[in-house]
Amino acid sequence: MFRLEDFNFHNKTVFLRVDLNSPMKDGKIISDARFKAVLPTIRYLIESGAKVVIGTHQGKPYSEDYTTTEEHARVLSELLDQHVEYIEDIFGRYAREKIKELKSGEVAILENLRFSAEEVKNKPIEECEKTFLVKKLSKVIDYVVNDAFATAHRSQPSLVGFARIKPMIMGFLMEKEIEALMRAYYSKDSPKIYVLGGAKVEDSLKVVENVLRRERADLVLTGGLVANVFTLAKGFDLGRKNVEFMKKKGLLDYVKHAEEILDEFYPYIRTPVDFAVDYKGERVEIDLLSENRGLLHQYQIMDIGKRTAEKYREILMKARIIVANGPMGVFEREEFAIGTVEVFKAIADSPAFSVLGGGHSIASIQKYGITGITHISTGGGAMLSFFAGEELPVLRALQISYEKFKEVVK
């Protein structure tokens, strides 16, 4: 795949696809983490004398965060300490004229790419390159730099459509993400421990099945709703209250798949030995084999128990490779953050090479000041897709573009 260092960008127009999709409140961005992650790439392009045209999406149609990129231009201007022009258009004549007016070292950001209906659906490269977004923008750009790892699992025009039309190059963040994930996945070091929590049960089951079948993991530790599904699949009773909650969330549909995975890999999948429930606003620990397990019928599971967290810590401290995605419980409430904090601290304290991803995972380590994890991935869904053994469309597009243009570039 092409790297930034392979090209001379002086006076060239570069379409830089990033993922600046950020949480917002009252029209203001409340976390600039994704902005800071791509600053090295933007600064490199500016210093190389490129004319930088940034493209990002923000929110999903009809969601609260679905808005223009005017605020993104303001945040970028502050972080870069230079003006970033907001172009209130994507690929129309106005946008193309504004792009042509850019001078070496200047930066502009296009309107929210999802304002274009073409950008909302996933389609093969062959269809994406026929879109107006790709056809119109390709007339006014020289190169495409992709630094949007968080959306690498999507196949949309701005992400993959330019692959056979313009040289498509990895940004620094994309390169860093790929290197870290490849190292974690393919490393011969052992033990390799996967820690899967949170609510993305379907994706997590795919990861468990793939890494155990391909012998990419020695052990999988579970937390969050992922653990609840596996615990039910093992035949434990989580109580009426919790089963009803899982049914409402559609999670009981995954129990059969979890049972099939356990039939093949039971010794390699660890589930909690105890849980913490919300007992009238307080944390109460319940051992799965104790007499008070009847409380599970009335009170909701909010976290893994302390004994489970201690057992997980012992395992993690001996690991050489750790991959983690998703919290152990409802970390937003301090009394139920114990499992998440203890497990993530263990990952940070472990001598292992560690990779952690997922929006809630990152939010939890920031909230509780946990440092020491080797690589924090910006991609939750993309990271899970990678470890599930699925082909990431953006990586495929980068490879296709390299094969198409490698001789031309030389």
Curated annotation (Swiss-Prot):
It comes from the Archaea. The keyword Kinase applies. One of its GO terms (molecular function) is ADP binding. It catalyses: (2R)-3-phosphoglycerate + ATP = (2R)-3-phospho-glyceroyl phosphate + ADP. ATP binds at residues 332, 358-361. InterPro entries: Phosphoglycerate_kinase, Phosphoglycerate_kinase_CS, Phosphoglycerate_kinase_N, Phosphoglycerate_kinase_sf. One of its GO terms (biological process) is glycolytic process. Its main location: cytoplasm. The keyword Cytoplasm applies. Pathway: Carbohydrate degradation; glycolysis; pyruvate from D-glyceraldehyde 3-phosphate: step 2/5. It is found in: Cytoplasm. Keywords: ATP-binding, Cytoplasm, Glycolysis, Kinase, Nucleotide-binding, Transferase. Belongs to the phosphoglycerate kinase family. HAMAP family: Phosphoglyc_kinase. Homodimer. This is Phosphoglycerate kinase.
